[in-house]
Amino acid sequence: SAPDELVLAQASRFYHFRDGVLVSISDAYDNRLRLCRDRSGRIERLDNGAGRSLLLRYELDRIVAVDYQVHRAKGREPYVWETEQNLVSYAYDEHGRLVCATNAVGESERYRYDDQHVILERQLAGGASFFWAWERSGKAARCVRHWASFSQMDTRYAWRDDGRVTVHNADGSQEVYVHDQRARLVQRIDPDGATHFKSYDDKGRLTVEQDPMGAVTAYQYDDAGRLVALFPGDDEPTSYEHDNGFVRVVRRGQAVWKYERNEQGDVTRRTDPDGEVTDYSYNKHGQLTGIWYPDHSCHRLVWNERGQLLEEQLPNGGIKRYRYDDLGRQVAREDEHGAQTVYEWDSVGRLIRLVLPGGSCREFSYNPYGKIIAERDELGHVTGYEYADGLHLISRRLNADGTQVKYRYDNARLLLTEIENE
């Protein structure tokens, strides 16, 4: 860090401040995400230091778009940031509330609020809508009904001031949740009457839980809040020994696992209960580069400067290779026999074409939930998929031979209840 930097550490993340402003976030290997700001002090760019960044665009002090950019140079010209694609766009109403979010292929979610700026409706890109009704206002607001545009979901909440809430589901079933004064769940009663209990210590850590069958699991912590013992009731207890904040030894009955770590906390040697040793090595960025197994075989991994896996040298001597596009998506894979598979993706990272080693291909189409609606196989046969009520759950599969399979979801949890197969 620079002499004028303030660094705050939290777990394996380090937050770097200069003049009271966050300028970068780093990990134990000093990989850094840099935050570049505009003249107004707003975060304008998130730069990973490897030629890739996210550009944040603003209007009226609100983020309206996020662009994925690549650092490029043409010929001998200086490097400049070029937008590879827009990832997401945002729209707001006159009160500054988010009302629409649109992804790279134009699929949009929409939002509606009450006059207290509490959300009332969320409409998904696939067509389904969710609604909320509230009681009270401000930070005391709590949901009393949550329902959807499809009939299976309509849930009502009956709150009591002692931390107890009863959930009434659309199918007539009920669930009960009981919280303590610090809003921690201490009891849950399932629709079938099964009861779960939880207890906590004065620091908010879970110490005991009991399942509906009466089995009790207990947890024990050290002064730093690290789990040092787990007592699973009728099973053997497990203990954990720590060193510099990381687990060094695990004991369960007579079995013992031991771990050696580097300065960053990654495991460099693992010894199992049989005394078998596995070693691990890492590069300067913290990526795994080698695994040495107990039989003395070795698995090596090669990475590029952008953190992408380029090559695997397998223990049997075979080599796998990988290629990526400018958006970081894998576009080709070569197996240990030299056979190559090619992948094509849409703008939101959904696989749309797969070219197999023999040259045949499979193609896929999707709905806004990322679910397949059509699949063309190597012989040109097309299988279609339909989804009812604007949901992500398949309602009918249309096979290439003309047959079909129907699916029904009839309960409040949208679980599959019936399959009709021709």
PLM features: residue spans?
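Extended charged/polar low-complexity repeat regions
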Residues: S1-E422
